[in-house]
Amino acid sequence: MNKILFSLGMLLLTVAAYADGTILFSTAKGSIDVPPYRIPGITCGHGGRLVASAARLVCGTDPGFGRVDCVVKLSYDNGRTWSEHEIDVACGDTSLINAHKTPMEAAYGDPAVVMDRERNEVLIMAVAGCTVYGKPSTNRQNPNLIAAIRSTDGGRTWQKPVDQTEDIYGLFDKGNVVDAAFVGSGKLFQSRVVKVGDYYRIYAALTARPNGNRVIYSDDFGRSWHALGGAAALPVPGGDEPKCEELPDGRVIITSRASGCRLLNIYTYSNTKSGEGCWDKPEKATMDGLALAPSTNPTNGEMLIVPAMRNSDGKPMYVALQSVPTGTGRNNVSIFYKELASPDDMRNAKVFASGWDGCYQVSSTVSMYSSMDLQADDRIAFFYEETLTKWGTKPNPVSTSFPQGEGEHNYDGCELVYKSFDLETITDGKYCVNRRINRGKFLKANYEDIVDSFVLTAAQKRKVKDVIKRLPAEPTSAQMDAILKGEVR
């Protein structure tokens, strides 16, 4: 009888978590002397594993104003239960802050997290030190620092942070120089298609000035990095906090924070292994014609593209999801969706930015940053900020950003809430997740239409289309490169 009651209790707990959400990190339960939380990120591993990351704002706000720590909580059952206590990833040290040089160990904030799809290895990229991104004193000689923090046991323990500041800033020194940058927080993106060496490729989108976003990638799970498109590439010159995702054909899409829209651009490889290729032109996705619209007070959001089936006719396709607050303020976080069923849905950035099909409202109150990923049980893990608790203000530290320690900063944060949804709920029953999709078959019609637009002889087009017909269920990067270049030999 006790076993039956225990099982029933666990079932009720599971239903409650799915219906109402689970607060993983709480600010409202604290005080002016208890660190608030912000900046959610979530990544899904194999076997139902989830890692939820957050910034513990010991100073009360962003890195640059004092100590900030990176922390995580873990789930091994697709979010039904979570570790009771938060796990320290990297903790800042206030005593190191000074007015002469910013030490990396002062703070670790704005975490961006990814778990390898084949291992229990987890990577967090964090902005480090004590410089304020927008301050003129934060420059190439005194930059925002960038730390890489690694776990090899699924997030239970973490290695010492590694300073990658010069490794990343240096990628752009011979092109469009970066004065200040940090990796867009939330979820780092790992390719489902591109694998060079031992790991699937990972991508990180940078908030950077001047000239907006850059994208970097790594083939060794963040031990070394390369600039996507080269040192001079400017994929979204007006972009703020960005994220990356991958189209079914292996192209990379960047989505960036902006007022009343998302700024999008697409990178097409000419040689996936070497990273060569080019960016399209940035476009605005305003989600015109829907009941809700992206907020005019922009925040960081997430894009996720999932394999799906259209329920009305059983057609296999993909569905793009984009989370962002809606309305006039930082509130009403929602998920917009768009079906990717034909070449016209994703041929270029302009086409991708238009024709969104609907929107699902997650929150009906103050809500801001969000992150999402596809769980092993085919539900969408959604981790976001809800409600804002303001406890007051604190004085700024004596640092390179505030040499005299002048001024004050807010001491506030949010409830970081985990929910999970099936795709039917988000899309009003129109689609369900379909991992059995034959990607090669899905891409064939798309590729044939693309090849028809190429300037090739009839014989050359026939040769390329013959290769397209023979595509396997999981085409290689080299096969896709050759088709998109029209250079099949």
Task: Indicate residue ranges for each PLM-predicted region.
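Positively charged n-region of N-terminal signal peptides that target proteins for export
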Residues: 1-4
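Hydrophobic h-region of N-terminal signal peptides that target proteins for export
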Residues: 10-18
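Asp-box/BNR beta-propeller blade signature and adjacent active/binding-site loops
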Residues: 20-442
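Anion-recognition interface
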Residues: 7
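Short stretches within intrinsically disordered, low-complexity N-terminal or propeptide regions
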Residues: 18-19, 447
